[in-house]
């Protein structure tokens, strides 16, 4: 028996989610159609609305529904301190620690030459422009402690130090190979407070 084309299309769409293989996608699609059609409709509306409304902040590159995000507009933030993260999820995790009061720049990825991801793909030119605006005094590199995250931090550090900026890195405490999105807030808070100059 072959699945109806619309169900096959839904299954294929669900496979695009990270960590979802063909069997999991098929189970989700069948569950939504069999047991939770209201949930399926809500999911469809939410996806459409997010795709239509969510854009990148003109200053920090994170997700927002306006030209500039609330964090960048917050006059209480320390504009001399810029934290560089890989994803909006990493930014959210740092925010939840309540230890960082500066601004952010979200790379939307990390360097990975094997996957064809280079400096342009992580918005390095935009980061350099932001970091050298005359306001930023220190750049905190909060990329993940994976091989790609470390390589990204090193590349950015060398690039910014060559322009006379102070660059620091989150202290260890975040496990090697760990991604910030999956680390508890206390560990991230300690790493932020114990960051070191690179």
Curated annotation (Swiss-Prot):
GO terms for biological process: DNA recombination; DNA repair. Keywords: DNA damage, DNA recombination, DNA repair, Metal-binding, Zinc, Zinc-finger. Pfam families: RecR_C, RecR_HhH, RecR_ZnF, Toprim_4. CDD domains: TOPRIM_recR. One of its GO terms (molecular function) is zinc ion binding. InterPro entries: DNA_Rcmb_RecR, Rcmb_RecR, Rcmb_RecR_Znf, TOPRIM_dom, TOPRIM_RecR. A zinc finger (C4-type) spans 57-72. Residues 80-175 form the Toprim domain. HAMAP family: RecR. May play a role in DNA repair. It seems to be involved in an RecBC-independent recombinational process of DNA repair. It may act with RecF and RecO. Belongs to the RecR family. This is Recombination protein RecR.
